[in-house]
Every structure is written in C-alpha cells, then in structure tokens.
C-alpha cells in the first residue's frame, strides 16, 4: 500500500492511526527497492503493477529495460528462494557467479544478442569457463554446465528454474525435457501478454507496445532504450491456455505468482493431472474491442466471404464500462450515435482538480475511436433489443402464469423448485451465441477469461495425426484453425506464387569430366624466388617467403579448383573459377581468366599453365618477361614457425597498403596464399579461417590474438551437382568481411540432356537434391553511374556474389520468391548455418551466398522505415548482390516505394531484377539523368559569344558552330580537390576529353587520351562520347556547344573552385553560365594533407583525406617547388610561376604561393582562388604573404603555430556539443494559462516581493579603499547623470548598477580586484584527494585538431577571424593585454534593488592569442573531466536538461543543500591557482605552458577603457577556462568542507552548486581551508532549492524559475529599435517552451520556494504568454543616477 501520508503523522490518538502506522512500517520494512532511474510514467506503471507491494525508489543505475528488470528481479528472488539446489535453464551470464546453489546450467550456443551478453559476462569464477566455451564453441570443461540446451541435456536434477528462457518451447516439449532430467518441479518465469490471443495487429497499452504479426510478437515497454521481447505466438498461446500436460509425461502447471502479465509457473510432474482452471488477467486495465472491418476496410466478421482476420483495439476498461453504463441507461428517445460520440469525447479528456484525477482520459487513434463507437452502438442496440424482448415476453409469461388455476402453481412449487438445478433469477437463452455473430458482442474482456486446457505429450503420435487431419479438414471448410500443430515450414502452395520471379525447377544435365589434379602438394617459398623478383617485391618479403613452406590441398570439381593452404598456424582458402574478381590495391580491376580444359590462368600481365606430371604438379609462370617453371611434389610439409608466418603476413600487408596509397594504377593485392601457393600470384575468393572464431581478417597481420599451433580447419561440404559454385560453410569473420567470388554463369543446356536420377558421387544431404539450369532471358533496362543495373527477368540468372531472398520474419520456407529459393537451395533455410544477422536479415553461405531479407507486411501496416531497413540490412557484405523488389508479392508493398528504397540502399555494382509488371512500371517511370534546358535567349547569347571567339586566332576552330535551343542530358561527377575524378575515367569509356588549360591537356595525353582544349575540340566532339574536365571553369558558350554536340557527356569538376572568367568583360559569360547540379559527390581526397582539409572544411564539410602528411603549411620559408601567383603581373615578376587559374586541376609535390598587393580585390571577391591555391600540393606548401591578404580570408599562421607549439596533435575526439531537443507537448498544461495583463502581473510581483518605484535608475556607492595593487585614473570623471530606457515596468527587481559611469567602473575595479588577497600556503594533496570523489585521477590528455576546430568555430560564430591571434611574443603588449568591462547584466534579488551599497560586477577578456593558446587544452581537459564524472554528478551545461530533471525527480526523499559564494572571484588566491596548475600537470600540459598560466594569473593589469589596475591573484571572469576552473574549485571546496549522507545528485556550475542528500555536516578539515583562503560561504538546507535559473524540487524535477525570469526582464532596456523587442519575444517563447508540460507544477513549486501566492506565478505565466504573442507594452523613462561617491584619494606607492 502507499502509506507515505501516515509516516510523519504527529501524535497517534486513535486505533486507526496506530494500525496505519504499523501498516506503513511493515510495508517499508518489506518494500521492494527500485534502483534504476525512472520517468514519472514508468514509476506509475511500476506502482500499479507491483501492488500491493510497497516500493522504495533509490535511483543509482541506468537500465535499458527498467520495468521488466525490476519485475524480473522480484520473480527471480521468489523462484530461487523456493528451488534450493537446482538446475537452471538459460541463465543470464552475469548471474552465474552470484548463485552457487545451481548445480548445473543448460545453455545453447550463442547467436545474435546472446553473443553480446556473453561478452559482458564476468571473466572470473564459474562464469569464465562458461563464457570461454560459449564464445569459442568449445565443449564444456566440467559438469556444471552444458551447451546442449534443456532438450538435449540429461543431467539429473529434481528441481529446476527457468527465468524467461522457455518462450521458444511448448509445454509438451518442456514435459519431455523434464522427464529426461528426472525433474519433478520446475519454476518458470514467463512473459505472457494477453494480446497474443488476438489476431495480428499493433496493440498499445499503458505499459507496453505489442506488435503481433501472426507468428512472432515483439513487446517493448515504456521507456526502453533497446529492443524488447520477441517470442513465438503459438508457444505463448500454449502457455496461457495450458494447465496440464497429458500422455506419457504428465504435468500440472500452476500459476503461483503474477506481476502484470509476468507469471511464475510451477510445473509439477503428477501421474494424474486434475483440472486446474484459472483466470490469468483479473486486474487487466484494457478491454479489446473488435472492429467490424479489418485492414483496408474489408469486412472481417464473415469467414465465408473473406478470410481476413478481425482487427482489435486496446481500450481502457474504465472507458468501455462508462460508455456501456451511459448508453444502456439512456432514455429510448435520447439514445443515438451522436450522443454516444459526444459522451466518448468527454470522457476521453483527462481532467485534474488539484491533486485529484477526476477523469483519467484516453489518447486514442482515429481507427480505435471509430471501432469503439461502432462496437458500443451495436452492442447497446443488441442489449436494448434483448431488454425489449425480455420485457415483452416476460409480461406475456406473467399473464399466462397468473391465469393458471391453483393446481399448476402448487405442482411447480413442490417439484420444480426442489430440483438441484434451480437457480433463482436464472434467465432463458433467447439466442444461441456464435462467436462470429454480431449478437455475440464486439469486445474481449481479459478480466473474465478462464483457461483449463490440456496439451498432449509429443510422443502421442496417434493423437497428433488425428488432430492434424481434423485441422486440415477445418481449413478445407474455410474455417480458422487454432491448432498448435502448424507446420514448421509455413504455408506453401499455389496461393503463394504471386511473384513473377517464381520459376520451375529443372534438372541440370551432366557435364563432361575434366582432368583432375586433386591432391596435396608441398610448396616451398624458395621455388618461387624468381617470380617474387619479377613481381618487384621488397627484399624483406622475398627473404621471409624463402624461409616458409606451405601445404596446399587441391580439390577440382566441375571446372573449378578449390585450394586449402596450410601455412604455419594459419589456414587459407581460395576458389578458382572463370571470371572471378581479384582484389586489387588500386583503381584498376582484375578478373581471372581460367580455362580448366586448357589448364591456363591469366589476369592482367600475369599468366600461368599447369599440368600433372610424375614428379608432382608442374606450373609455368609468365610475368614481366619472366618464364619460370616449378614442380611441386605431392605430400605434406613440416609446419613453419608461427612467428615467422605472422611476420611475413605483417610485412606483406604493409607492402600492399603502401602500394595502395601511392600507386596511381595499382596492382594485385597479394595475399599470403597467393605468393606461397601453387597458382601464384592469384588468390581469388581469399578466405582466412582462424582458429579463433572471433578473430577476423583485420587481425591476420597482427599479433593481437594468441597463436595456436594446432589449427583445426572446419569441415568443407562435399560438392554436389549444382550450378552455383560451393562456398566454405563457415565465414571468415563475424562481419563477413570476405571477398567471395561471383558464381559461375550457367551454361546453356544441350539439346538433349539425359536426366539425372541421382546425384553425382560425393554429393551429400547438404547439397540441393534438385538443381537447375536456365538459359538467360534477362533484359537490361537501366545502368546507374555507380555500375548498378536494373534488369527485367529472373533473379536466378544473375552472376552476382549474393542473391537476396524476400523472406519472412522467421526465415522459413514460404510462398512466392521464397518458395522458389526453397526449391533451389533448401539448405539455405537452416538457421544453424546462418553466419551473421543484421537486424531482421540473415546471411548464409550454404550452399551459396544468400541474404534472407525481411520486408514489412503492408497488409497489416504501412511501414516505410522498416522497408528502408530491409534493404539497408543487406549491405553488410563484400561483393555484389542481386535483388528482387522486396515485399511487392505476398506482402503487397507498392512497387514505387520498394524501388525507391532499393535506390537509396544498395551498393555499387548491385543488380535489381523486375518481373514484367514491375518492368512496365519502371519503363513508364524510368529515372533520367539531369537535364540542362537551353532557351532561345541563352542560345542567342552563346552564339554571339562563339562569333566573337571565332574572330580570334585561338577560336578559329569554332567558326560556323552554333548552339540551338533544346534539352541536354548530362552526368556531372563533382568532388573535393584531389578526389580522383579524372583517374576514374578509363579509355574504354570516352572518345574525346575537353580540358580548359594546356597543363591539363598534356596530363591527359600522357595517359593515352585524346585531349583537346575547348576551342579545337569543336572539330571532334560531334557524336562522340565526351568527358569535360574542370567543366565549371570552361567558357559557358563552349561548354554548351560541346554538351549539345556530344553523344554522351560526362562533366568533371568542383563547383567551389574558380568558375569561367569573363576576360573580355563583355558581360556574356555570367549571362549564360549554366546551373549544373552534380549527380554524385566524392568526399575523399588523395592529395590534400590534413591541415589543408581543416582549412577548407567550411567549403567542403564532409571532406576526408588518405594523405599521411599532417602539416604542410609553412609561412616565411624560402620558395620551393612550383610557384603560384594570382595575377598576370605577378606572373611576369616571378619567372617560372603560373597563375592559380592556370594551375586548376594540376597536382604538384611542393608549391609556393606568392600573394601580391594587386591581388587583394581578387582574393576578397573570389575565395575560390585561395581554395585552388591551397589544394595543389601533396607534401609542402610555403606561403609568402607580405601584404597579409590570406589572413584577411581566415588563413592565419599564428593559430596553427601556437596550436602545435602548445603540444597539439592531428586527430579526432568526441565533440563537446551536447544534443538537446525541445520537449514534446505530451501533457501541455501550458495551454490552460491564457494571456494576462502585463501591468497587473508586474504590479502583483512588486507587491509580493516588497519592491516599490524609485525616482533614480541606480546609486553610485562610495568607492572602497584600494588595499593592494596600483590604480591608474583618468583625467576627468565626468559622465552622463541620467539613463534613458524602454522598460516593461517602472519597478525593477534586480540589484541595479550604472555600467556606463566612470566612477562605477572605478568602484568595481577597486571593490572587486583591489581588495587584499588572503594567501594560503599549504599542500594541495588533501584537497585533491577530496576532489577525487567527483573528479578521479585524470591522466594524460590528448589535445587534437578537434578542439582547435571547435575554438575556431566559436570565434567565427562571434564574427571574429584569425587576425587578432598573434605570434607568441611576450614582449608584445597586444599578446598579453587583459581588457576589463563593466557588466550591464544585473542580478535578480528579492532584497533591496537600489540602495544596496554594493559595487558592480566586472568581466575581463584575455587576448585572442592567449585564448587560442590555452583554449584547446582547457576544452580537452573539460572533456576528460566529463568522461570521469560519477553517476548523479552534473557539470556546467554539459548535459541535457531532461536528464538532470529526471535525476532530481528520482531523488524523492532528499533535501536540497545550496551554497552561495560571496565574492567568489575575489577570494581566489595562490592556493586555488596552485590546484588548477596541479590538475594541468596531471593532464600532461607542458610545463612551460603551466608556468606561463601561473605567471599571467599571479600578476596582471586590467585595462579598462580609461582606467587600469595592476593587481595580483584573484580570478577574472572572462579568461579562457573560467567555467572549467571555477567549477573545479567549487567542487573542491564543497567536497572538502562538507560530508553528505544519502548522496543522490550534485550539480556544479561556476560558483553555483546544489547537492541532494538527506543531511550534511561540516568536515573536520573545513575550518582550516575556509579560514586560510578567506572563503565566504552561505549555506542553505531546505526541501526546495534554486540552481542556475531553475527550481530544484526532489521528486518532481528541475522546473523553470518563472519569478526570476520575469524579474530579470524588468531591468533590461528593450529599445529603442524593434530588434530588441523581437529578441524579447524570442527569449520569452524559448522560456515558455520549457513550461509546456510542467506549467501547473511550476505554479505550486515556484510559489512555495519564493513564499509568494500561486496566483502570482499564474499571472506571470499569462503575462509571458502575452509577450510571446507580440503584445508587450514598453514605457520610455528618464531616470537620474544618484552619486554618493566622495573624492577618490590617490595613493602613491
């Protein structure tokens, strides 16, 4: 029971109160402790589910499934307490070490999510052996566990427990397994939601969302952050309905504990099970209302006309009960559907009166409302009809009874009443109720369900056969079958063949035999030394290969050679088939040409022939002029040393990667078995089979994994007679990172092929019994730029690596395309052979690479996101894949959405096969390339430009050429500089290349292309395939001419670089410049170094680089390499240089840019020139910028130099941005607050706070005495003595000051920073040890370019550039200047606002040089601190407000400890500075940088506009790291000075801090620190506190501070322009957005913390609503400033 209200009752005067207190104490003593953080909704759900148990909430952990896990833990305690020493089924890996009473545990080999659970299992104790066996597939090392599952184990045990591990077993299967174990009792915890009894659909209850698709059910509870339960529907129905098992293994099933729909079942072996009826859901809060219409509006209640099942909707029971009561009691004249709908609308709104919920409400969908109205109206009509009939027939019956004589009543009284069947008030059945009759009702009430069914044991085959036949007979009649004997393979038949991709299965003809070279051969590396030298391999690899010897096992079947290479402790597999793709380390592609009849192989410049001889296998290698023969003897070689093998693999990998980075064309990627193998250097279909099942290809070249001497290679399936090549049965890595060869194409069948009555020798059951061979009839419809193709035809004609099956969610044989796959590849549906799962998709390599993809069933629900995911989940592979349109068959997904999803989620080279219907749709909606429309005006202008060009010597080739109006299709490949756009073009793809410059033309011609400049190309582009390089920089009239004349045109270029320049200044170029949209963007550059990428990231946000050069920009060094200039005049003055425009598209190793003063206008007007200049080099770029032109566009050397000087590195770290979102209007209590009067709200605020209008704007208090330092005064102290403001009200609620007054600035300088500092010389170790409670030891911190980028980004957002950052020269005053300003933002107060007598507040600003020097370090340290913060500790603003509010709401029983520092900055001294430096040293900051920081902080000069102060120590609020070090010092003081009991939450931001705890006390060492540093602490301890603009209310959350926000608006100047008024409106709108769901709660809480009336807060919210609506009223006021300062005394020191 909920008894909090009785715990604090004062005085017990009655027996009722005594009983209540005893009940409360007993409930709390036996309460369930809830440890996870929960939302309000989750707390309400748990309280309702766990009744009558008392709950105690002590949040300290975050769980993915908090509700289920709390219930699970409670039921687990119950089961373990009653089972004693027992056998456990499917134990969670984390629970193994905690339960020593378990004598044996039954597991299954982990798949899917179970693998993750085993990875997080303990690595010590009993769990270690279980973990090792499960992850490595090893047998059990002792009898305490097994991996055979409950059904496959026979360990004897009398008692067992199963915690949520029997959902995939039926009661009959469990009965047999218990008999096998000799088990008499089994405690089983199961999740049995009642919705599984309903037809497929989506059901949302107050606790969870259930998705039921007919076979599987997925349950996700409120607030879950990952996937929920996923169970088989038939098994869940069996567990709900069954109370006993009969047969040879009888059982009694009793429900001994229930929490919601979570049950503990006690299964007891009993010889004669007796009836045990039970009501499973007596406390169900939902009623399921049946819709008369099914999906899509089809009638669903009449099976003779439609087989669609009914649709049900979950409706709150109170809604249905009230609706029935209202409708059944209405007067006949008043009853109508309209009144019923009005009443339903009324009770669906939630109504709260104070804390009393008057109406719970219901948030329903349109479909649910329609179904409820229909069902309620018809049900009430039926009841009214029954009532009318009952009264009518009853009256007639009464008339007949009273008309009887005396004898008849006496006979009835004597004989009928004495019968045992007599029940007073029993009604006659007027109608026989059938479940599909409308009169049977429309709703299912789980509260009245009663079950008592028996399940026969599986061993009773006679009963099974009889039930199966009866089931089939009922299906033949067209009735629904609820039999649990559904076939495992699903429904197959003619009704499933609605996909045109389905084809028949024919028998392949026998193929001619090929000479066999199968056997085992010894391959020494010394025999291949000449070949290695011809391959130009490094001497290190040649030497290491010479010391190794491999054993190669060859298997040749059907013109295919499979090799298994044993090299030391590693095993490699390769498959040689004709057309196999060979992996390359460059852009060139290599395909293997293999002729088994001629015994030859060739690819690129390499070829070989082989033949069997008496001495073994003789191979002849031909490569790079080499003709070498080698003979390999049969046998098995001794195993090479594992260390030598690993060293060879590592060296070979480094060589491949080096060639991949630096080679322009590339070569073969050499694998170990490709060099030390029979058919070197080929290794198609390379697969490494590791001894460790979780050791992938990425670890082949490292020593990360322990090297095992004995390697057991997995069994290879025998090769049957099938058309696709066989693939090894196990994947190389868990992620399928293997390059599989494409299947060999099917040869056309001979005219008369004899049928095969049995498979060839060697075929096993694992191979398909029926194979096929079909001629190709596919038709190419479209080709995409990435090489993907769309065909009309059959999927099985594809030669892609993978075939994608349109599977169901269970991956069982079905209809349509799935049935066609089952006929061809039945072994591919074996779940045990699935090598990987990605979402719902399953990958298998048996008998060939196949992906079973799962599309959504659009008959149930349209789910575009699931459709996108179905295609996306098939892309976790290497190689190409062949698709059909997923879901367009049985699942009725429209063709258009499925095709669009494939377009967005496929990989280059994939193929899509369409049936005829989809092909006709595709041809009608064929995707087209981008088009450029040439209008008559553009054509006329272009022809004018061509005429002007043809009159020059350069343009004579264009004479007579014309551009005509029309439409031009084009392909435009855009990319970042150096992305390889030009290198992607091959000679076979193009006839003519058009380039803008001579340098580019020569470069293309050196590669063998026919390249021309834009003018001369006019003679050769007609009807040719044309590629235009650097297209944006071509003169637009020539670009249009070549695009229109070419047969096909492919544009290359970068839209961000230099466009075409109008050299003639005739205005024709900008008039006709075409707007070209790129068809593809390339973001990876192979040219630009890392620092250049960071500089140009603003123009290319997604740029990445493969360059290993980190820094390439240098200033002030001598010129190197190619010189670049901006103007022709500079080119003439620097011989050998080229302009940036001429260098566009070129690549140089080293370049030098010379910026001259005459290029200022060019650079400022065209940033593209700077981008082109920066992106021409690969190694080094020297900048000679005497005029400082590049600094003006943001290219500064000081920022980069200072960053590397401070120890920065190139790299990436976690960004500092915290993602935040706007709260959804789920409660929207703010809508209940109408706009109110601004004047009345502010007057009420003044009345409640006691503030009154004053005739002055501010008071200048007397200036304090200067206690330390030296003050420099201005000559004159005259200033304005009045203030003009546009204000919301004339009463302010802030501590007002005069920031524009010179005397006010002097008072602040002296009063804040001229006070004497109290020094404290002590060790920092004690305070650092105390601080470790919140900030543990940090360790070395890495400062990367990520922090530098964030710093520059912050500068740019403030409108700053790098010009203010100077070289680090401490002799330069501009480097170390600290500027001082007076704050114009005053502090909200409930006290005195004018005559407060306090000096103002100041803010300082360090130089941009120091900010850029220390800023990246402080950002990196802050990130490290955030990563180490304990749970429940919040720092600054680095968290989402909802997370902080949830943590506060979870700390229900806490008080709020608040501390307010007075003069926080002024009291910081040498001790606080020393603590900062100690933490910097702990983080690895360079010593010189720490000493520099200490020097700047210990002695400084604050430079005000007309004053300055030389002082010592203190803290300046505007220096870099202000928030960081203020917060750290705040944490250190609080944790060192105070001890907290029942600590829950702590938050620190600058000098503001709160701690949520039950009580606190001052620690023993606090007085020393407080007195030594002169700290001024003001501590408050109360139920509700204030922190950083929010009200902290434990148990409720962090609420916006309405009073403070409204009060701070009163001191602002909101004029004179309309911009300030708009800023006010936006600020108020943002604040109101935070009040969306908590407005009413804020009224109660904020009024309590400030001691004001709730009506004031209500009125203030209404006032803010009016301001947000743009209805703010401003008043202009002129108020004087009262000067109370005396003459300032000058003291000479």
UniProtKB/Swiss-Prot annotation:
Question: Segment Hinge: which positions?
Answer: 712-778
List each copy of the (+)RNA virus helicase C-terminal domain by range.
1083-1216
Note down the stretches annotated as region Disordered: 737-769
Q: Name one GO cellular component term.
A: host cell perinuclear region of cytoplasm
What GO MF annotations does this protein's record show? ATP binding; cysteine-type peptidase activity; helicase activity; metal ion binding; mRNA methyltransferase activity; RNA binding; RNA-directed RNA polymerase activity
- Supply the EC number(s): 2.1.1.-, 2.7.7.-, 3.4.-.-, 3.6.4.-
Instruction: Share the domain note from the entry.
Output: Contains a methyltransferase domain, a Y-domain, a putative protease region, a zinc-binding region with similarity to calycins, a proline-rich disordered hypervariable region (HVR), a macro domain (also called X-domain), a helicase domain and an RNA-dependent RNA polymerase domain. Since the boundaries and the activity of the putative protease are not clearly defined, the zinc-binding region might be part of the putative protease.
- The annotated region (Putative protease) lies at 442-509
Q: Where is the composition biased (Pro residues)?
A: 740-753
Q: Name one GO biological process term.
A: RNA processing
Q: What does this protein do?
A: Methyltransferase: Displays a capping enzyme activity. This function is necessary since all viral RNAs are synthesized in the cytoplasm, and host capping enzymes are restricted to the nucleus. The enzymatic reaction involves a covalent link between 7-methyl-GMP and the methyltransferase, whereas eukaryotic capping enzymes form a covalent complex only with GMP. Methyltransferase catalyzes transfer of a methyl group from S-adenosylmethionine to GTP and GDP to yield m(7)GTP or m(7)GDP. GDP is a better substrate than GTP. Y-domain: Indispensable for virus replication.
Please tell me where this protein is predominantly located. Answer: host cell
| Coiled-coil features, chain-numbered ranges | none
Q: How is it modified after translation?
A: ORF1 polyprotein does not seem to be processed into distinct enzymatic domains by a viral protease belonging to ORF1, but could be processed by a host serine protease like thrombin.
What regulation of activity is recorded for this protein? Putative protease: Inhibited by chymostatin.
UniProt key word Hydrolase: yes
The taxonomy runs: Viruses, Riboviria, Orthornavirae, Kitrinoviricota, Alsuviricetes
**Annotated spans, NTPase/helicase:** 960-1204
Superkingdom to which the source organism belongs: Viruses
The protein's annotated catalytic reaction(s) are: RNA(n) + a ribonucleoside 5'-triphosphate = RNA(n+1) + diphosphate; GTP + S-adenosyl-L-methionine = N(7)-methyl-GTP + S-adenosyl-L-homocysteine
Which cysteines link up through disulfide bonds? 434-481
**Any idea where the (+)RNA virus helicase ATP-binding domain is?**
934-1082
Tell me what this protein is called: Non-structural polyprotein pORF1
- Organism the protein comes from: Hepatitis E virus genotype 1 (isolate Human/Myanmar/HEVNE8L)
Q: Which residues bind ATP?
A: 975-982
Q: Which cofactor does it need?
A: Mg(2+)
Question: Where are the residues of the annotated region Methyltransferase?
Answer: 60-240
Stretch list, region Zinc-binding: 510-691
């Amino acid at each position: 029971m909920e008894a909090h209200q009785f715990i604090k009752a004062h005085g017990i005067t009655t027996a009722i109160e005594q009983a209540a207190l005893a009940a409360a104490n007993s409930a709390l003593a036996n309460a369930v402790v809830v440890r996870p953080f929960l939302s309000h909704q989750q707390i309400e759900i748990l309280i309702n589910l766990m009744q009558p148990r008392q709950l105690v909430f002590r949040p300290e952990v975050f769980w993915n499934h908090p509700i289920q896990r709390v219930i699970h833990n409670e039921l687990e305690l119950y089961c373990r307490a009653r089972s004693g020493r027992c056998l456990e089924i499917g134990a969670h890996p984390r629970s193994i070490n905690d339960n020593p009473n378990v004598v044996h545990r039954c597991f299954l080999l982990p798949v899917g999510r179970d693998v993750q659970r085993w990875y997080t299992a303990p690595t010590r104790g009993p769990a270690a052996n279980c973990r090792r066996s499960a992850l490595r597939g090893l047998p059990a090392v002792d009898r305490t566990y097994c991996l055979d599952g409950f059904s496959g184990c026979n360990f004897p045990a009398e008692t067992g427990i199963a915690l949520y591990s029997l959902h995939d077993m039926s009661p009959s299967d469990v009965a047999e397994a218990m008999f096998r174990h000799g088990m008499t009792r089994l405690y089983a915890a199961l999740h049995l939601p009642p919705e599984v009894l309903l037809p497929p659909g989506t059901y949302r209850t107050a606790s969870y969302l259930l998705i039921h698709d007919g076979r599987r059910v997925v349950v996700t509870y409120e607030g879950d952050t990952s996937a929920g339960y996923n169970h088989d529907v038939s098994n869940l129905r069996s567990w709900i309905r069954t109370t006993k098992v009969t047969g040879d293994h009888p059982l009694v099933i009793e429900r001994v504990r229930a929490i919601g729909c979570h049950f503990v079942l006690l299964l007891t072996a009993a010889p004669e099970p007796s009836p045990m009826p039970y009501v499973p859901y007596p406390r169900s809060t939902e009623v399921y209302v049946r819709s008369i219409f099914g999906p899509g509006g089809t009638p669903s209640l009449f099976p003779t006309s439609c087989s669609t099942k009914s649709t049900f909707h979950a409706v709150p029971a109170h809604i249905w009960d009230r609706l029935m009561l209202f409708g059944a009691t209405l007067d006949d004249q008043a009853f109508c559907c309209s009144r019923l709908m009005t009443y339903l609308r009324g009770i669906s709104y939630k109504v709260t009166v104070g804390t009393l919920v008057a109406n719970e409400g219901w948030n329903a969908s349109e479909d649910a409302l329609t179904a409820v109205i229909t069902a309620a109206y018809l049900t009430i009509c039926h009841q009214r009809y029954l009532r009318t009939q009952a009264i009518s027939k009853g009256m007639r019956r009464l008339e007949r009874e009273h008309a009887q004589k005396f004898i008849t009543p006496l006979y009835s009284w004597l004989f009928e009443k004495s019968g045992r069947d007599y029940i007073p008030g029993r009604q006659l059945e007027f109608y026989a109720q059938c479940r599909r009759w409308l009169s049977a009702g429309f709703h299912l009430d789980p509260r009245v369900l009663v079950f008592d069914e028996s399940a026969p044991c599986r061993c009773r085959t006679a009963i099974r056969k009889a039930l199966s036949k009866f089931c089939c007979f009922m299906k033949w009649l067209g009735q629904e079958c609820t039999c649990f004997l559904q076939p495992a393979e699903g429904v197959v038949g003619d009704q499933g063949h609605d996909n045109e991709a389905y084809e028949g299965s024919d028998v392949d003809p026998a193929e001619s035999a090929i000479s066999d070279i199968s056997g085992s051969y010894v391959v020494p590396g010394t025999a291949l030394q000449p070949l290695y030298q011809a391959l130009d391999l490094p001497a290190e690899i040649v030497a290491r290969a010479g010391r190794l010897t491999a054993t190669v096992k060859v298997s040749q079947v059907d013109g295919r050679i499979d090799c298994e290479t044993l090299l030391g402790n590693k095993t490699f597999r390769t498959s040689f088939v004709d057309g196999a793709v060979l992996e390359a380390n460059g852009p060139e592609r290599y395909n293997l040409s293999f002729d088994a009849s001629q015994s030859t192989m060739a690819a690129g410049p390499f070829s070989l022939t082989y033949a069997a001889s008496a001495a073994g296998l003789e191979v002849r290698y031909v490569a790079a002029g080499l003709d070498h023969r080698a003979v390999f003897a049969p046998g098995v070689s001794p195993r090479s040393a594992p260390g030598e093998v690993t060293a060879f693999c590592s060296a070979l990998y480094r060589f491949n990667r080096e060639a991949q980075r630096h080679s322009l064309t590339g070569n073969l990627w050499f694998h170990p078995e490709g060099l030390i193998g029979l058919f070197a250097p080929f290794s198609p279909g390379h697969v490494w089979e590791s001894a460790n099942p979780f050791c992938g290809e990425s670890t082949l070249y490292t020593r990360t994994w322990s090297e095992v001497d004995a390697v057991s290679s997995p069994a290879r399936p025998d090769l049957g007679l099938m058309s696709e090549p066989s693939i090894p049965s196990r994947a190389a890595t868990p992620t399928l990172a293997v390059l599989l060869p494409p299947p060999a194409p099917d040869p056309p069948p001979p005219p008369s092929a004899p049928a095969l009555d049995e498979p060839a020798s060697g075929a096993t059951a694992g191979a398909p019994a029926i194979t096929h061979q079909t001629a190709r009839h596919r038709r190419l419809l479209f080709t995409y730029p990435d090489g993907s193709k769309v065909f009309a035809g059959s999927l099985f004609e594809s030669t892609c690596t993978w075939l994608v099956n349109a599977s169901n969610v269970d991956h069982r044989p079905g209809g349509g395309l799935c049935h066609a796959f089952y006929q061809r590849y039945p072994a591919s549906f074996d779940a045990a052979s699935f090598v990987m799962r990605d979402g719902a998709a399953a990958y298998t390599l048996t008998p060939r690479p196949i992906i079973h993809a799962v599309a959504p069933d659009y008959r149930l629900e349209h789910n575009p996101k699931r459709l996108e995911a179905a295609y996306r989940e098939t892309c976790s592979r290497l190689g190409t894949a062949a698709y059909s349109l997923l879901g367009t068959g049985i699942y009725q997904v429209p063709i258009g959405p499925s095709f669009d999803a494939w377009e967005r989620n496929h990989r280059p080279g994939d193929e899509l096969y369409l049936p005829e219907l989809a092909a006709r749709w595709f041809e009608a909606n064929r995707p087209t390339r981008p088009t450029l429309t040439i209008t008559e005006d553009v054509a006329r202008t272009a022809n004018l430009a061509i005429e002007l060009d043809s009159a020059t010597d350069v343009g004579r080739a264009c004479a007579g050429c014309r551009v005509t109006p029309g439409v031009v299709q084009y392909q435009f490949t855009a990319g970042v500089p150096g992305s390889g756009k030009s290198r992607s073009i091959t000679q076979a793809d193009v006839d003519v290349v058009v380039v803008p410059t001579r340098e580019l033309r020569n470069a293309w011609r050196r590669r063998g292309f026919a390249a021309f400049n834009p003018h001369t190309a006019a003679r050769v582009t007609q009807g040719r395939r044309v590629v235009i390089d650097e297209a944006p920089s071509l003169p637009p009239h020539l670009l249009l001419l070549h695009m229109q004349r070419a047969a096909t045109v492919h544009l290359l270029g970068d839209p961000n670089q230099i466009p075409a320049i109008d050299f003639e200044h005739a205005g024709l170029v900008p008039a006709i410049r075409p707007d070209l949209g790129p068809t593809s963007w390339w973001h990876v550059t192979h040219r630009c170094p890392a620092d250049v990428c960071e500089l140009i990231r603003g123009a290319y946000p997604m740029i990445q680089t493969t360059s290993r050069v980190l820094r390439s920009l240098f200033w002030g060094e001598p010129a190197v390499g190619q010189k670049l200039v901006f103007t022709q005049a500079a080119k003439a003055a620097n011989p050998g240089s080229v302009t940036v425009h001429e260098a566009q598209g070129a690549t140089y190793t080293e370049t030098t840019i010379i910026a001259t003063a005459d290029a200022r206008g060019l650079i400022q007007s065209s940033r593209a020139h700077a981008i082109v200049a920066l992106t021409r080099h690969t190694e080094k770029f020297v900048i000679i910028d005497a005029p400082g032109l590049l600094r003006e566009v943001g290219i500064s050397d000081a920022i980069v130099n200072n960053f590397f000087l401070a120890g920065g590195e190139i790299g990436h770290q976690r960004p500092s941005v915290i993602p935040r979102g706007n709260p959804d209007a789920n409660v929207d209590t703010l809508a209940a607050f109408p706009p109110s009067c601004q004047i009345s709200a502010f007057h009420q605020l003044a009345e409640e706070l006691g503030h009154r209008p004053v005739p002055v704007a501010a008071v200048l208090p007397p200036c304090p005495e200067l206690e330390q330092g030296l003050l420099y005064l201005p000559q004159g102290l005259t200033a304005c003595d009045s203030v003009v403001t546009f204000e919301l009200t004339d009463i302010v609620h802030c501590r007002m000051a005069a920031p524009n007054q010179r005397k006010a600035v002097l008072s602040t300088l002296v009063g804040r920073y001229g006070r004497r500092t109290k020094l404290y010389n002590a060790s920092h170790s004690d305070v650092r040890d105390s601080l470790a409670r919140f900030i543990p030891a940090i360790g070395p911190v890495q400062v990367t370019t990520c922090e530098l980028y964030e710093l520059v980004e912050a500068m740019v957002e403030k409108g700053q550039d790098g010009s203010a950052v100077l070289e680090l020269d401490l002799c330069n005053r501009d480097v170390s200047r600290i500027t001082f300003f007076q704050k114009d933002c005053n502090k909200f107060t409930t006290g005195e606002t004018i005559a407060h007598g306090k000096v103002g507040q100041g803010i300082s600003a360090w130089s941009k040089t120091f900010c850029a020097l220390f800023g990246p370090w402080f950002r990196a340290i802050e990130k490290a601190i955030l990563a180490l913060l304990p749970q429940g500790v919040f720092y600054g603003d680095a968290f989402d407000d909802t997370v902080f509010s949830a943590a506060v709401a979870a700390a229900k029983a806490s008080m709020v400890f608040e501390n307010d520092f007075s003069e926080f900055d002024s009291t910081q001294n040498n001790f606080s500075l020393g603590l900062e430096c100690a933490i910097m040293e702990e983080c690895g900051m360079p010593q010189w940088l720490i000493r520099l920081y200490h020097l700047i902080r210990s002695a400084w000069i604050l430079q005000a506009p007309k004053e300055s102060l030389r002082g010592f120590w203190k803290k300046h609020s505007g220096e870099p790291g202000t928030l960081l070090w203020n917060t750290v010092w705040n944490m250190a003081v609080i944790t060192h000075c105070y001890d907290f009991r029942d600590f829950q939450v702590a938050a620190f931001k600058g000098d503001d801090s709160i701690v949520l705890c039950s009580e606190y006390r001052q620690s023993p060492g606090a007085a020393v620190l407080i007195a030594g540093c002169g700290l001024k602490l003001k501590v408050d301890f109360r139920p509700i506190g204030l922190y950083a603009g929010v009200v902290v209310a434990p148990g409720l959350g962090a609420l916006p501070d309405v009073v403070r926000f409204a009060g701070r608006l009163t001191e602002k100047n909101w004029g004179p322009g309309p911009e300030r008024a708009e800023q006010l409106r936006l600020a108020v709108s943002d604040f109101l957005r935070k009040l969306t769901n908590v407005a009413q709660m804020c009224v109660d809480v904020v009024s309590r913390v400030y001691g004001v009336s709730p009506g004031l807060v209500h009125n203030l919210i209404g006032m803010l609503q009016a301001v947000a609506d743009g209805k703010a009223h401003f008043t202009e006021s002129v108020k004087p400033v009262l000067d109370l300062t005396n003459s300032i005394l000058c003291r000479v020191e």
